[in-house]
From Swiss-Prot:
Belongs to the transketolase family. DXPS subfamily. It comes from Francisella philomiragia subsp. philomiragia (strain ATCC 25017 / CCUG 19701 / FSC 153 / O#319-036). The gene is dxs. The lineage of its organism: Bacteria, Pseudomonadati, Pseudomonadota, Gammaproteobacteria, Thiotrichales. Pfam families: DXP_synthase_N, Transket_pyr, Transketolase_C. It catalyses: D-glyceraldehyde 3-phosphate + pyruvate + H(+) = 1-deoxy-D-xylulose 5-phosphate + CO2. CDD domains: TPP_DXS, TPP_PYR_DXS_TK_like. Its cofactor is Mg(2+); thiamine diphosphate. Thiamine diphosphate binds at residues 76, 117-119, 149-150, 177, 284, 364. This is 1-deoxy-D-xylulose-5-phosphate synthase. Keywords: Isoprene biosynthesis, Magnesium, Metal-binding, Thiamine biosynthesis, Thiamine pyrophosphate, Transferase.
Amino acid sequence: MSKYTILDKINTPSDLKLVPEGQLKELASELRTFLVDTLDVSGGHFASSLGATELTVALHYVFNTPYDNIVWDVGHQTYIHKILTGRKDKLITIKKDGGISGFPKRSESEYDTFGVGHSSTSISAALGMAIADRLQGKHSSSIAVIGDGAITGGMAFEALNHAGGIKEDILVILNDNEMSISDNVGGLSAHFSKIISGGFYNSIREKGKEVLKNIPPMFEFVKKIETQTKGMFVPANFFEDLGFYYVGPIDGHNVVELVKTLRILKDHKGPKLLHVITKKGKGYTKAESDPIKFHHVAPSFHSGDAQSKASKPTYSNIFGNWICQKAAKDKRLVGVTPAMKEGSDLIRFSQQYPNRYFDVAIAEQHAVTFAGGLACQGLKPVVAIYSTFLQRAYDQVIHDIALQDLDVLYAVDRAGLVGADGATHDGSFDISFMRCIPNHVIMTPSDENETYHMLELGYEYKGPAMVRYPRGAGIGAEITDNLDIKLGKAKLVKKGSRVAILNFGTLLPLANQLADKYHITVVDMRFVKPLDEQMINQICQNHNIVFTLEESSIAGGAGSAVNEYIFANDLSKNITVRNFGLKDEFLTHGTKDLLLDYSNLSFNKIAEVLEKLLSHKK
């Protein structure tokens, strides 16, 4: 007999609506069990979905999806949503080659109303949908589900301000898992939340306002009393000042109460915000105790046979070690990150130097300009940021840092392909969008040792500098004391004939493999900006074929920089140039090796091109 007696009957929200309300609590339990069993095989984002289980059930139970629009923020919490919207049997393929995405994706399901992966976008998207539907005569509901972390992003506040200002009919659900369901959320507060979300209260409240508006002093007095009374229990004032009708906080794990409240709010017109309190990792004891550790789980995490982590240090570890060692030597060093402490390996730094560590939350724009302010007053800020999130601070990088030539070092993690997380998290574009900015140094280390020493060089450089490095473990290169890296100078790694590979970054082992078979020259270029023009001149004079190699976008990338120099200096007459990098498209999720091969960044794909060119050159 199946242990999923209710869930087995559900494939779509239409099936869910047939479940008696009294069985929803049991359904939530089955969903959690199914999630544990499935991710124990596949791995994936875990704790967030556990925390949003009842909320997800209630949303699809009350609203008419996909006619009504549910927009999820970030997307880590959407595995239960995927289970309930026709992808239950595919969940085991999540983030795998050819499987479903780990995030909402419009091309995957009509229930995924808006593609996401980055933070703080949901309210803006839901507001746009609400207005579009209204203008086209469609009587739908638009709901944004946003977490307490994501709502700290400036874009979320911009959207709240807009929605409240125009009084658009939109529901924002604040999924707050920062606090537990404690006494101040239960008891009087829960009772008060029930009262203020009730239809009778709403009716009396609105009709009373109309009457009292004719008596201005009395209206202001009553309004003040209501605000102060609610303020005793809930953080209503801020959202109501923005024009939202605030309800909550309520228990986000009481599915019956959620259903009741959502039904009431569905009929309440105008901007409204429902504040729900949840516990990340709910229902799985270890995840409740350590939600950060169980944010994402590996296969066999539950059965106890999970694979051990790689013994080699990751590039993030190299950065984490470097910044702690450098901070011990230079009191000017300060670390800045937009909510990436764990991912960027800044935990130890934050513990050793708490007064010099600044986590500015999900606020990439602020992080960069804040770093500029620190630099103006004589400190040396190191901004630890993922490549994909650096995109969000582009104007600040140009206007606030580069234009003023401020002394800021960007430690750009997750540069290149990230594999299972897919296009929303790939670091494909940082070289392209940073290369065109004056006053910038861009470094592409080929291994851990170069990463360490380029961080050192970037720190000592006076002006904006960027070191980009990939996700995951390196090749195991030892960190030495005597690596000689000079600004803008490449390194000749192997000397061959006819063919040269100009490598930018950690694909150097691939270049060396090709060199071993075809006796070709390999250059570790190290710098995209400034380019080693002397090395390029030398290569073009002594070779017939030049390949550039990078794990970043070909369009505007390092290879493009080489092309520009070659053609600007009339060096192309006797040589053939080919650029190898990421194609001009958004890649899907999958294993990194598969994605590299698809991008022609594999031994066989490059060798095929090389052999064709060599045969034509004979």
